Amino acid sequence: MKICVLPGDGIGPEITAQAVRVLNSLDLKFEMEEALLGGGAVDATGNPYPEATQKLARAADAVLLGAVGGPKWDSLPREQRPERGLLGIRKDLNLFANLRPAILYPELANASTLKPEVVAGLDILIIRELTGDIYFGQPRGVREENGERVGFNTMVYSESEIRRIGHVAFQAAQKRDKRLCSVDKMNVLECTQLWRDVMIEISRDYPDVELSHMLVDNAAMQLVKAPKQFDVMVTGNMFGDILSDEASMLTGSIGMLPSASLDDKNKGLYEPSHGSAPDIAGKGVANPLATILSAAMMLRYTFGLEEQALRVENAVKKVLAQGYRTGDIYERGTNKVGTREMGDAVLAAL
Protein backbone atom coordinates (compact mmCIF):
# COMPACT_ATOMS: atom_id res chain seq x y z
CA MET A 1 0.00 0.00 0.00
CA LYS A 2 1.92 2.98 -1.35
CA ILE A 3 1.09 6.51 -0.23
CA CYS A 4 2.59 9.63 -1.78
CA VAL A 5 2.65 12.36 0.90
CA LEU A 6 2.58 15.96 -0.34
CA PRO A 7 2.78 18.31 2.68
CA GLY A 8 2.54 21.40 0.46
CA ASP A 9 2.58 24.99 1.73
CA GLY A 10 1.59 27.00 4.81
CA ILE A 11 0.18 24.77 7.54
CA GLY A 12 0.34 21.76 5.18
CA PRO A 13 3.48 20.15 6.66
CA GLU A 14 2.18 20.49 10.25
CA ILE A 15 -1.21 18.91 9.60
CA THR A 16 0.01 16.11 7.31
CA ALA A 17 2.58 15.12 9.95
CA GLN A 18 -0.29 14.34 12.36
CA ALA A 19 -2.23 12.33 9.76
CA VAL A 20 0.92 10.32 8.98
CA ARG A 21 1.36 9.57 12.70
CA VAL A 22 -2.22 8.28 12.84
CA LEU A 23 -1.76 6.07 9.75
CA ASN A 24 1.50 4.67 11.13
CA SER A 25 -0.19 3.78 14.43
CA LEU A 26 -2.63 1.38 12.72
CA ASP A 27 -0.04 -1.38 12.15
CA LEU A 28 -0.83 -1.59 8.45
CA LYS A 29 1.98 -1.97 5.95
CA PHE A 30 2.11 1.45 4.34
CA GLU A 31 5.03 2.64 2.23
CA MET A 32 5.09 6.44 2.44
CA GLU A 33 7.22 8.82 0.43
CA GLU A 34 7.19 12.63 0.49
CA ALA A 35 7.42 14.99 -2.48
CA LEU A 36 6.92 18.65 -3.37
CA LEU A 37 3.73 20.26 -4.69
CA GLY A 38 2.63 23.89 -4.90
CA GLY A 39 4.62 26.93 -3.78
CA GLY A 40 7.45 24.95 -2.20
CA ALA A 41 7.84 23.07 -5.49
CA VAL A 42 7.92 26.38 -7.41
CA ASP A 43 10.65 27.70 -5.08
CA ALA A 44 12.73 24.52 -5.47
CA THR A 45 12.19 23.67 -9.15
CA GLY A 46 10.24 26.49 -10.82
CA ASN A 47 7.36 24.05 -11.41
CA PRO A 48 4.31 23.67 -9.09
CA TYR A 49 4.01 19.97 -10.09
CA PRO A 50 7.59 18.76 -10.74
CA GLU A 51 8.46 15.62 -12.67
CA ALA A 52 9.72 13.77 -9.58
CA THR A 53 6.35 14.37 -7.90
CA GLN A 54 4.50 13.22 -11.01
CA LYS A 55 6.41 9.91 -11.01
CA LEU A 56 5.79 9.32 -7.32
CA ALA A 57 2.08 10.22 -7.52
CA ARG A 58 1.49 7.94 -10.52
CA ALA A 59 3.22 5.00 -8.82
CA ALA A 60 1.31 5.41 -5.52
CA ASP A 61 -2.05 3.87 -4.61
CA ALA A 62 -3.12 7.08 -2.89
CA VAL A 63 -1.93 10.65 -2.35
CA LEU A 64 -2.21 12.53 0.96
CA LEU A 65 -2.03 16.30 0.50
CA GLY A 66 -1.76 19.11 3.06
CA ALA A 67 -2.57 22.39 1.31
CA VAL A 68 -1.08 24.57 -1.42
CA GLY A 69 -0.81 28.28 -2.10
CA GLY A 70 -0.24 31.58 -0.37
CA PRO A 71 0.12 35.30 -1.13
CA LYS A 72 3.88 34.85 -1.61
CA TRP A 73 3.25 33.36 -5.08
CA ASP A 74 0.28 35.50 -6.19
CA SER A 75 2.35 37.68 -8.53
CA LEU A 76 3.79 34.74 -10.51
CA PRO A 77 2.57 33.96 -14.05
CA ARG A 78 -0.62 31.89 -13.87
CA GLU A 79 1.03 28.63 -15.01
CA GLN A 80 3.59 28.84 -12.21
CA ARG A 81 1.17 29.47 -9.35
CA PRO A 82 0.85 26.77 -6.64
CA GLU A 83 -2.82 26.11 -7.49
CA ARG A 84 -1.70 24.96 -10.94
CA GLY A 85 0.06 22.09 -9.18
CA LEU A 86 -3.24 20.96 -7.69
CA LEU A 87 -5.08 21.23 -11.02
CA GLY A 88 -2.15 19.42 -12.64
CA ILE A 89 -2.18 16.42 -10.31
CA ARG A 90 -5.98 16.08 -10.55
CA LYS A 91 -5.75 16.04 -14.34
CA ASP A 92 -2.66 13.80 -14.44
CA LEU A 93 -4.27 11.14 -12.22
CA ASN A 94 -7.70 11.43 -13.93
CA LEU A 95 -9.41 12.28 -10.66
CA PHE A 96 -12.99 12.97 -11.72
CA ALA A 97 -15.04 12.44 -8.54
CA ASN A 98 -14.73 14.81 -5.59
CA LEU A 99 -16.35 13.62 -2.33
CA ARG A 100 -16.86 16.18 0.42
CA PRO A 101 -18.67 15.22 3.60
CA ALA A 102 -20.28 17.94 5.72
CA ILE A 103 -20.76 16.49 9.19
CA LEU A 104 -21.71 18.43 12.30
CA TYR A 105 -20.34 16.81 15.42
CA PRO A 106 -22.71 17.27 18.40
CA GLU A 107 -19.91 18.86 20.46
CA LEU A 108 -19.50 21.59 17.81
CA ALA A 109 -23.18 22.48 17.37
CA ASN A 110 -22.52 26.01 18.67
CA ALA A 111 -19.89 26.63 15.99
CA SER A 112 -22.53 26.71 13.25
CA THR A 113 -24.16 30.03 12.41
CA LEU A 114 -27.50 28.23 12.05
CA LYS A 115 -29.80 27.31 14.94
CA PRO A 116 -28.79 24.02 16.61
CA GLU A 117 -32.15 22.40 15.79
CA VAL A 118 -31.59 23.10 12.06
CA VAL A 119 -28.13 21.51 11.92
CA ALA A 120 -28.02 18.99 14.80
CA GLY A 121 -27.13 15.57 13.40
CA LEU A 122 -26.19 16.96 9.98
CA ASP A 123 -24.39 14.40 7.77
CA ILE A 124 -24.29 15.21 4.05
CA LEU A 125 -22.00 13.89 1.31
CA ILE A 126 -21.57 16.14 -1.73
CA ILE A 127 -20.20 14.50 -4.87
CA ARG A 128 -18.85 16.90 -7.48
CA GLU A 129 -17.69 16.06 -10.99
CA LEU A 130 -14.16 17.45 -11.28
CA THR A 131 -12.89 17.26 -14.86
CA GLY A 132 -15.65 18.61 -17.11
CA ASP A 133 -18.15 21.48 -17.22
CA ILE A 134 -17.54 25.19 -17.82
CA TYR A 135 -14.14 25.09 -16.05
CA PHE A 136 -12.61 22.98 -18.83
CA GLY A 137 -14.94 23.48 -21.82
CA GLN A 138 -13.57 24.92 -25.07
CA PRO A 139 -13.72 27.47 -26.65
CA ARG A 140 -13.02 29.98 -23.89
CA GLY A 141 -11.39 33.39 -23.72
CA VAL A 142 -11.88 37.12 -24.25
CA ARG A 143 -12.14 38.61 -27.75
CA GLU A 144 -12.88 41.97 -29.40
CA GLU A 145 -16.33 42.22 -30.94
CA ASN A 146 -18.03 45.36 -32.28
CA GLY A 147 -15.46 47.55 -30.57
CA GLU A 148 -15.73 45.99 -27.09
CA ARG A 149 -14.35 43.02 -25.18
CA VAL A 150 -16.51 39.91 -24.92
CA GLY A 151 -15.74 37.09 -22.45
CA PHE A 152 -16.93 33.55 -23.22
CA ASN A 153 -16.80 30.07 -21.69
CA THR A 154 -18.35 26.78 -22.75
CA MET A 155 -20.40 24.53 -20.47
CA VAL A 156 -20.11 21.00 -21.82
CA TYR A 157 -20.72 17.47 -20.51
CA SER A 158 -20.66 14.21 -22.44
CA GLU A 159 -23.03 11.39 -21.59
CA SER A 160 -20.11 9.17 -20.54
CA GLU A 161 -18.80 11.82 -18.10
CA ILE A 162 -22.24 12.09 -16.49
CA ARG A 163 -22.64 8.30 -16.28
CA ARG A 164 -19.26 7.91 -14.64
CA ILE A 165 -19.98 10.37 -11.80
CA GLY A 166 -23.56 9.09 -11.55
CA HIS A 167 -22.41 5.55 -10.73
CA VAL A 168 -20.05 6.88 -8.03
CA ALA A 169 -22.93 8.82 -6.47
CA PHE A 170 -25.45 5.97 -6.53
CA GLN A 171 -22.90 3.56 -5.04
CA ALA A 172 -22.08 6.06 -2.28
CA ALA A 173 -25.80 6.44 -1.53
CA GLN A 174 -26.15 2.65 -1.29
CA LYS A 175 -23.62 2.66 1.56
CA ARG A 176 -25.49 5.43 3.41
CA ASP A 177 -29.18 6.31 3.74
CA LYS A 178 -29.98 5.34 0.11
CA ARG A 179 -31.14 8.82 -0.91
CA LEU A 180 -29.54 10.76 -3.78
CA CYS A 181 -30.39 14.30 -4.84
CA SER A 182 -29.08 15.32 -8.27
CA VAL A 183 -28.63 19.08 -8.70
CA ASP A 184 -28.91 20.78 -12.11
CA LYS A 185 -30.33 23.82 -13.91
CA MET A 186 -32.31 21.96 -16.57
CA ASN A 187 -34.92 24.72 -16.93
CA VAL A 188 -32.40 26.96 -18.75
CA LEU A 189 -29.31 24.86 -19.59
CA GLU A 190 -29.54 22.05 -22.16
CA CYS A 191 -26.26 20.66 -20.86
CA THR A 192 -27.88 19.99 -17.49
CA GLN A 193 -31.09 18.67 -19.06
CA LEU A 194 -28.84 15.92 -20.43
CA TRP A 195 -27.40 15.56 -16.90
CA ARG A 196 -30.90 14.94 -15.49
CA ASP A 197 -31.87 12.55 -18.30
CA VAL A 198 -28.74 10.42 -17.78
CA MET A 199 -29.19 10.35 -13.97
CA ILE A 200 -32.74 9.03 -14.48
CA GLU A 201 -31.43 6.34 -16.86
CA ILE A 202 -28.72 5.24 -14.39
CA SER A 203 -31.22 5.10 -11.53
CA ARG A 204 -32.74 1.94 -13.08
CA ASP A 205 -29.54 0.10 -12.09
CA TYR A 206 -30.04 1.14 -8.45
CA PRO A 207 -33.67 0.38 -7.50
CA ASP A 208 -32.77 0.56 -3.78
CA VAL A 209 -31.71 4.24 -4.05
CA GLU A 210 -34.34 6.98 -4.03
CA LEU A 211 -33.39 9.60 -6.66
CA SER A 212 -34.65 13.18 -6.50
CA HIS A 213 -33.79 16.29 -8.53
CA MET A 214 -33.37 19.90 -7.51
CA LEU A 215 -32.52 23.09 -9.40
CA VAL A 216 -29.26 24.61 -8.18
CA ASP A 217 -30.77 27.89 -6.96
CA ASN A 218 -33.29 26.00 -4.83
CA ALA A 219 -30.58 23.61 -3.61
CA ALA A 220 -28.48 26.56 -2.38
CA MET A 221 -31.53 27.84 -0.51
CA GLN A 222 -32.54 24.45 0.93
CA LEU A 223 -29.00 23.80 2.24
CA VAL A 224 -29.46 26.78 4.55
CA LYS A 225 -33.17 26.34 5.24
CA ALA A 226 -33.40 22.59 5.90
CA PRO A 227 -30.02 20.88 5.30
CA LYS A 228 -30.94 17.62 7.02
CA GLN A 229 -33.28 16.69 4.15
CA PHE A 230 -30.15 15.71 2.14
CA ASP A 231 -28.11 12.51 2.32
CA VAL A 232 -25.96 12.38 -0.85
CA MET A 233 -25.96 15.19 -3.42
CA VAL A 234 -24.38 14.91 -6.89
CA THR A 235 -23.74 17.76 -9.30
CA GLY A 236 -21.41 19.18 -11.94
CA ASN A 237 -18.12 20.96 -11.48
CA MET A 238 -19.21 24.59 -11.08
CA PHE A 239 -22.38 23.98 -9.05
CA GLY A 240 -20.46 21.49 -6.90
CA ASP A 241 -17.67 23.99 -6.28
CA ILE A 242 -20.19 26.46 -4.84
CA LEU A 243 -22.53 24.07 -2.99
CA SER A 244 -19.74 22.09 -1.29
CA ASP A 245 -18.28 25.32 0.12
CA GLU A 246 -21.73 26.40 1.27
CA ALA A 247 -22.36 23.04 2.95
CA SER A 248 -18.96 23.15 4.65
CA MET A 249 -19.91 26.34 6.49
CA LEU A 250 -23.07 24.75 7.91
CA THR A 251 -20.71 22.91 10.24
CA GLY A 252 -19.02 26.06 11.53
CA SER A 253 -15.43 24.98 10.97
CA ILE A 254 -13.81 24.17 7.66
CA GLY A 255 -10.93 22.84 9.81
CA MET A 256 -13.03 19.71 10.42
CA LEU A 257 -13.86 18.77 6.83
CA PRO A 258 -12.00 16.16 4.77
CA SER A 259 -12.25 15.49 1.04
CA ALA A 260 -11.40 12.79 -1.48
CA SER A 261 -10.88 12.98 -5.24
CA LEU A 262 -11.06 9.59 -6.96
CA ASP A 263 -10.35 8.01 -10.33
CA ASP A 264 -12.38 5.15 -11.81
CA LYS A 265 -10.35 2.53 -9.88
CA ASN A 266 -10.62 4.32 -6.50
CA LYS A 267 -7.08 5.63 -6.54
CA GLY A 268 -7.45 8.91 -4.71
CA LEU A 269 -6.07 12.25 -3.64
CA TYR A 270 -7.05 13.02 -0.04
CA GLU A 271 -6.86 16.52 1.41
CA PRO A 272 -8.56 18.78 3.94
CA SER A 273 -11.16 21.18 2.51
CA HIS A 274 -9.40 24.20 3.99
CA GLY A 275 -6.52 26.20 2.52
CA SER A 276 -2.88 26.70 3.51
CA ALA A 277 -3.58 29.42 6.15
CA PRO A 278 -0.17 31.13 5.80
CA ASP A 279 -1.07 33.53 8.63
CA ILE A 280 -0.81 30.71 11.21
CA ALA A 281 1.84 28.56 9.48
CA GLY A 282 4.65 27.40 11.76
CA LYS A 283 2.83 28.40 14.95
CA GLY A 284 1.69 24.88 15.84
CA VAL A 285 -1.96 25.94 16.23
CA ALA A 286 -3.58 24.58 13.04
CA ASN A 287 -6.39 22.05 13.30
CA PRO A 288 -5.16 18.66 11.95
CA LEU A 289 -8.53 16.90 12.25
CA ALA A 290 -9.67 17.50 8.64
CA THR A 291 -6.41 15.93 7.42
CA ILE A 292 -6.73 13.01 9.84
CA LEU A 293 -10.33 12.48 8.64
CA SER A 294 -9.06 12.66 5.03
CA ALA A 295 -6.70 9.80 5.92
CA ALA A 296 -9.75 7.89 7.21
CA MET A 297 -11.45 8.46 3.83
CA MET A 298 -8.32 7.04 2.19
CA LEU A 299 -8.60 3.89 4.30
CA ARG A 300 -12.26 3.56 3.25
CA TYR A 301 -12.25 4.42 -0.46
CA THR A 302 -8.82 3.44 -1.80
CA PHE A 303 -7.84 0.58 0.52
CA GLY A 304 -11.32 -0.76 1.39
CA LEU A 305 -10.46 -0.80 5.11
CA GLU A 306 -13.85 0.26 6.47
CA GLU A 307 -13.14 -0.99 10.00
CA GLN A 308 -9.90 1.02 10.26
CA ALA A 309 -11.58 4.10 8.77
CA LEU A 310 -14.28 3.91 11.45
CA ARG A 311 -11.63 3.49 14.14
CA VAL A 312 -10.00 6.78 13.12
CA GLU A 313 -13.34 8.61 12.81
CA ASN A 314 -14.46 7.34 16.22
CA ALA A 315 -11.14 8.45 17.74
CA VAL A 316 -11.81 11.99 16.43
CA LYS A 317 -15.32 11.89 17.93
CA LYS A 318 -13.89 10.73 21.25
CA VAL A 319 -11.31 13.53 21.32
CA LEU A 320 -14.06 16.12 20.73
CA ALA A 321 -16.20 14.52 23.45
CA GLN A 322 -13.21 14.78 25.80
CA GLY A 323 -13.20 18.54 25.20
CA TYR A 324 -10.00 18.96 23.16
CA ARG A 325 -10.17 21.93 20.74
CA THR A 326 -7.78 23.79 18.47
CA GLY A 327 -8.28 27.56 18.26
CA ASP A 328 -10.67 27.49 15.28
CA ILE A 329 -13.26 25.40 17.18
CA TYR A 330 -12.47 26.56 20.71
CA GLU A 331 -15.20 27.77 23.05
CA ARG A 332 -15.10 28.62 26.73
CA GLY A 333 -15.01 25.57 28.98
CA THR A 334 -13.10 23.37 26.53
CA ASN A 335 -9.40 22.47 26.49
CA LYS A 336 -7.45 24.54 23.92
CA VAL A 337 -4.58 22.57 22.36
CA GLY A 338 -2.13 22.92 19.47
CA THR A 339 -1.61 20.84 16.34
CA ARG A 340 0.67 18.19 17.85
CA GLU A 341 -1.35 17.91 21.09
CA MET A 342 -4.47 17.26 19.02
CA GLY A 343 -2.56 14.54 17.16
CA ASP A 344 -1.45 13.09 20.51
CA ALA A 345 -5.07 13.04 21.71
CA VAL A 346 -6.25 11.16 18.60
CA LEU A 347 -3.42 8.62 18.99
CA ALA A 348 -4.37 8.13 22.65
CA ALA A 349 -8.02 7.62 21.66
CA LEU A 350 -6.94 5.00 19.10
Swiss-Prot record:
It is found in: Cytoplasm. The record marks 135, 185 as: Important for catalysis. Pathway: Amino-acid biosynthesis; L-leucine biosynthesis; L-leucine from 3-methyl-2-oxobutanoate: step 3/4. It catalyses: (2R,3S)-3-isopropylmalate + NAD(+) = 4-methyl-2-oxopentanoate + CO2 + NADH. Pfam families: Iso_dh (PF00180). Signal peptide: none annotated. InterPro entries: IsoCit/isopropylmalate_DH_CS, IsoPropMal-DH-like_dom, Isopropylmalate_DH. Its main location: cytoplasm. SUPFAM superfamilies: Isocitrate/Isopropylmalate dehydrogenase-like (SSF53659). Mg(2+) binds at residues 217, 241, 245. Substrate binds at residues 90, 100, 128, 217. One of its GO terms (biological process) is L-leucine biosynthetic process. Keywords: Amino-acid biosynthesis, Branched-chain amino acid biosynthesis, Cytoplasm, Leucine biosynthesis, Magnesium, Manganese, Metal-binding, NAD, Oxidoreductase. It comes from the Bacteria. Binds 1 Mg(2+) or Mn(2+) ion per subunit. Catalyzes the oxidation of 3-carboxy-2-hydroxy-4-methylpentanoate (3-isopropylmalate) to 3-carboxy-4-methyl-2-oxopentanoate. The product decarboxylates to 4-methyl-2 oxopentanoate. Belongs to the isocitrate and isopropylmalate dehydrogenases family. LeuB type 1 subfamily. This is 3-isopropylmalate dehydrogenase 1. It comes from Dechloromonas aromatica (strain RCB). The lineage of its organism: Bacteria, Pseudomonadati, Pseudomonadota, Betaproteobacteria, Rhodocyclales.
